């Protein structure tokens, strides 16, 4: 008898232990991310070929205490390595675990490697060569809490690699995870007709077909670790292989189960067909290109098991919420009598099915924790799960009716106003209803949602549900497609995170404002490139700019500079610390047909630039951040603490009849008028003048002040 460890993803332990017991293994004991067991060599071959759940199987050749580098070396040296592999084979050490005297896994691997080659040398043999990437013989070592385990990799490359996958899609599902879904859902025991309406590359259906046809999942594999192990019995292994081939041939002829798969992506359907052909089960599975919302019921009753798209995989969250909600309707209306199992990492998405789960489990898709929910759909029932939707809600149009009505009202009122003003981007909703605590901005034909932090007294589950309701209700209320809606989450600003880049993918559009055009990026950054609350302030800058030298400090994307230039400024100097925003400002100038020759764009630490500046300006606009401690700045910046010092310097750069417009977004900002007056400035608050209609609900969104030289 040999002692083994079968490794598997976290959460597989229970299923794997049952599988090993059914194979006939003894001393089966669950551990973290795997199961220990004992078996004969022949049974070990059979388990390695037939396991649908294990990722790797190793045969344990040493287990004992280890408290020092010397003990580690001696434990490895005492193993009779020449009896395990030939010195003509390349080898490698996979070491896992740290602690105590082992600071890193490389140290542990090196110690064992030294012991192995020394043992060969002392036995009179030439040393074997190390091959880290693709060694013929692999040693597996684990160190934990002073205990060392050394094993031989019996199975070879990861067992989830069955050998039938041509390539993967954007979000592949590992084969042993698909198999565990089939086991834990109860399908493997029942083996009835199976449908996957989000089939992707076909993994769930192919694994199910292999089960139904009694085909060993390892039959297509080209390589096993034990083939380089000197205790390998080729005759015994060939017997196990022949038995598996015979079972597969018989199983294909006896299989009565029907399999149906569909996907909206034709590329994935083609890939699924190729994979099924490679696995030898293509004649059993009917694949089609189809939107899951249009999928037909293939038979009276059956199982649906699927891994639908979710945030970490594919798609816009608003589109996905709509998809899940509508798919839940589809299930209730058309699939009465069916059993359904869904894998999803996003609790809010799977909750949007609005179905009551019979059972909820956790599984890991790689490092991603997922919910695996089982449902029984009752025939002729369209009733939704009452606790999730308000009483009487049966249609998506009835979700958050007060919110939807407010949106429609605001669109009607603000839409007319915006058209009259000559703008096509504005704040549509600003936490008008306290329970729906979001800001919604309309940018041309697109919508951006930002969620405000909820009070600590409101449970997280409630805030998540309300946000889901907003995302579900908004497309219907606005009459737009969900892909026109973007959700952004705002966190407390910390240093350089003020304008943190969010994604490589860009959604760029052009907006118009009082005759000016601006480029927006709705997805690349937390902010879009245009602060809508400063719209009137920018207009004021343009109105005051004619014939004047203008300075725009902390310029962001230069929108105020554009208004100044269009307003007839003699010259505009645009200063910002970010190269990205200076380039963006130039693009905005070019978009408006403004010749850059008379205007200056400066990438610099704004505070240092002011200290070094010797020019004078007739109009200065400054809208600094509330706080910043960027690595590129000499000092940190706090608008409350530092505004007097900065404004005092800027007053000196102001021509005798010049004007300075100072704005910031600090909620409880207190302007030190007394100190500025002492520096020779006249200070007037112009908040009301600069507050647009779409921000009247939030009058403290910013502070705006007009400074001139004292009389």
Swiss-Prot record:
The name this protein goes by in its record: Ribosomal RNA large subunit methyltransferase K/L
Family: Belongs to the methyltransferase superfamily. RlmKL family.
Reactions accelerated catalytically: guanosine(2445) in 23S rRNA + S-adenosyl-L-methionine = N(2)-methylguanosine(2445) in 23S rRNA + S-adenosyl-L-homocysteine + H(+); guanosine(2069) in 23S rRNA + S-adenosyl-L-methionine = N(2)-methylguanosine(2069) in 23S rRNA + S-adenosyl-L-homocysteine + H(+)
Gene3D superfamilies xref list: 3.30.2130.30, RNA methyltransferase domain (HRMD) like, Vaccinia Virus protein VP39
Summary of the function given for this chain in its UniProt record: Specifically methylates the guanine in position 2445 (m2G2445) and the guanine in position 2069 (m7G2069) of 23S rRNA.
Matching SMART domains: THUMP
Any single Gene Ontology cellular-component annotation: cytoplasm
Keywords of this entry: Cytoplasm, Methyltransferase, RNA-binding, rRNA processing, S-adenosyl-L-methionine, Transferase
Claim: Plastid is one of the keywords in the record: no
Predominant localisation class: cytoplasm
The keyword Phosphoprotein is assigned to this record: no
Domain named THUMP: residues: 43-154
EC number: 2.1.1.173, 2.1.1.264
PANTHER family according to UniProt: RIBOSOMAL RNA LARGE SUBUNIT METHYLTRANSFERASE K/L (PTHR47313), RIBOSOMAL RNA LARGE SUBUNIT METHYLTRANSFERASE K_L (PTHR47313:SF1)
Compartment annotation: Cytoplasm
Principal EC category: transferase
Gene Ontology MF annotations: 23S rRNA (guanine(2445)-N(2))-methyltransferase activity; RNA binding; rRNA (guanine-N7-)-methyltransferase activity
């Amino acid at each position: 008898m040999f002692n083994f460890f079968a490794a598997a993803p976290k959460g597989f332990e229970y299923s794997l232990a049952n599988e090993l017991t059914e194979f006939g293994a003894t001393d089966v004991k669950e551990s973290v991310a795997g199961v220990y067991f004992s078996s004969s060599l022949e049974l070990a071959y059979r388990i390695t070929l037939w396991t649908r759940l294990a990722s790797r199987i190793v045969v344990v050749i040493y287990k004992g205490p280890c408290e020092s580098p010397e003990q580690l070396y001696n434990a490895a040296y005492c193993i009779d390595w020449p009896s395990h592999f030939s010195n003509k084979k390349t080898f490698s050490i996979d070491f896992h675990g740290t602690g105590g005297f082992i600071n890193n896994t490389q140290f542990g691997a090196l110690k064992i490697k030294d012991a192995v080659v020394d043992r060969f040398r002392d036995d009179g043999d030439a040393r074997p060569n190390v091959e880290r990437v693709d060694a013929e013989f692999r040693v597996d070592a684990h160190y934990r809490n002073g205990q060392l385990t050394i094993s031989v990799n019996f199975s070879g490359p990861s067992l989830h690699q069955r050998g039938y996958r041509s390539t993967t899609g954007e979000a592949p599902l590992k084969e042993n995870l698909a198999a565990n879904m089939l086991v834990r859902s109860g399908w493997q025991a029942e083996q009835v007709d199976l449908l996957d309406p989000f089939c992707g590359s076909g993994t769930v259906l192919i694994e199910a077909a292999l089960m139904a046809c009694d085909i060993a999942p390892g039959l297509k594999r080209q390589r096993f670790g034990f083939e380089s192990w000197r205790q390998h019995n080729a005759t015994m292994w060939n017997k196990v292989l022949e038995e598996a081939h015979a079972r597969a041939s018989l199983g294909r002829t006896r299989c009565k189960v029907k399999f149906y798969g569909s996907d909206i992506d034709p590329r994935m359907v083609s890939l699924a067909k190729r994979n099924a052909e490679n696995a030898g089960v293509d004649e059993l599975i009917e694949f089609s290109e189809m939107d899951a919302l249009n999928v037909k019921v293939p038979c009276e009753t059956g199982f649906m098991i699927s891994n639908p798209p979710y945030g970490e995989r594919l798609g816009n969250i608003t589109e996905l919420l709509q998809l899940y909600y509508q798919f839940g309707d589809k299930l209730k209306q058309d699939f009465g009598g069916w059993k359904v199992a869904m894998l999803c990492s996003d609790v809010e998405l799977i909750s949007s099915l609005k179905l009551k789960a019979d059972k909820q489990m956790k599984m890991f898709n790689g490092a991603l924790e997922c919910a695996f929910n089982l449902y029984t759909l009752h025939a002729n029932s369209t009733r939704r799960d009452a606790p999730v939707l308000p009483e009487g809600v049966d249609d998506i149009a009835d979700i958050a009716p007060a919110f939807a009505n407010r949106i429609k009202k605001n669109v009607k009122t603000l839409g007319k106003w915006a058209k009259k003003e000559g703008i096509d981007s504005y704040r549509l909703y600003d936490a008008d209803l306290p329970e729906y605590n979001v800001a919604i901005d309309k940018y041309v034909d697109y919508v951006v949602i930002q969620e405000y932090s909820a009070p600590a007294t409101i449970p997280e589950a409630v805030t998540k549900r309300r946000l889901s309701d907003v995302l579900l209700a908004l497309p219907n209320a606005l009459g737009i497609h969900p892909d026109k809606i973007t959700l952004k989450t705002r966190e407390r600003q910390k240093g350089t995170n003020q304008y943190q880049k969010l994604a490589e993918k860009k959604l760029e559009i052009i907006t118009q404002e009082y005759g000016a055009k601006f480029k927006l990026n709705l997805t690349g950054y937390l902010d879009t490139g245009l602060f809508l609350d400063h719209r009137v302030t920018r207009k004021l800058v343009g109105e005051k700019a004619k014939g004047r030298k203008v300075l725009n400090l902390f310029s962001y994307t230069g929108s105020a500079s554009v208004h100044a230039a269009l307003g007839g400024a003699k010259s505009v100097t645009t200063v910002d610390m970010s190269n990205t925003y200076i380039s963006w400002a130039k693009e905005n100038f070019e978009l408006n047909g403004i010749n850059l020759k008379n205007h200056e764009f400066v990438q610099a630490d704004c505070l240092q630039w002011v200290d070094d500046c010797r020019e004078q300006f007739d109009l200065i606009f400054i809208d600094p951040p509330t706080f910043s401690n960027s690595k590129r700045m000499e000092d940190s910046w706090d608008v409350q603490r530092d505004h007097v010092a900065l404004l005092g310097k800027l007053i000196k750069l102001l021509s005798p009849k010049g004007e300075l417009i100072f704005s910031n977004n600090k909620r409880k900002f207190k302007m030190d008028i007394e100190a500025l007056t002492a520096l020779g400035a006249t200070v007037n608050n112009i908040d009301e003048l600069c507050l647009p209609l779409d921000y009247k609900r939030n009058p403290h969104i910013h502070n705006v002040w007009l400074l001139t030289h004292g009389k």
